[in-house]
């Protein structure tokens, strides 16, 4: 508990995200560097209850005048989808590069 009293939802959510995704060990990062700590976002993104709670919290930060949400491919598709479902706003997926087939 914080000195302000019981944890509010934001603090509880932050604690639960860290509990689910913060890892200690020996990790090789994308840069090739080594780290003894790693935050694996896929661990919270694949937890339906945690993803739902995060989508609900983030939806409170979306301005009322927003017409569409956007999420970069792969990195934020699940999170963008969770916010989209909570707000009812359509989600646009942003590709790094155009693909040569389909839509």
Language-model regions, residue ranges each:
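A glycine-rich, hydrophobic loop/mini-helix early in the fold
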Residues: 53-61, 74, 79-82, 87
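Fold-independent oxyanion-binding glycine-rich loops
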Residues: 41-42, 72-74, 95-97
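Short glycine-rich phosphate-binding loop at a beta-alpha junction
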Residues: 65-73
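Gly/Ser/Thr-rich beta-alpha loop segments that engage phosphate groups in nucleotides
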Residues: 27, 34, 73, 77-78, ...
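Conserved hydrophobic/aromatic pocket- or pore-lining residues that grip, position, or stack substrates
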Residues: 32, 69, 91
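Short, glycine/charge-rich flexible loops or terminal/linker lids adjacent to PRPP-binding catalytic cores
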Residues: 81-103
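Active-site-facing substrate-recognition patch
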Residues: 2-64
């Amino acid at each position: 508990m914080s000195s302000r009293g019981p944890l509010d939802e934001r603090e509880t959510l932050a604690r639960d995200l860290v509990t689910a995704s913060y890892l200690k060990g020996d990790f090789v990062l994308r840069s090739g560097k080594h780290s003894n700590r790693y935050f694996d976002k896929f661990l919270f993104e694949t937890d339906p209850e945690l993803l739902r709670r995060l989508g609900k919290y983030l939806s409170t930060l979306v301005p009322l005048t927003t017409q569409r949400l956007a999420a970069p491919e792969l990195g934020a598709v699940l999170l963008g989808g969770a916010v989209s479902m909570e707000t009812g706003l359509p989600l646009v997926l942003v590709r790094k590069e155009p693909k040569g087939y389909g839509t």
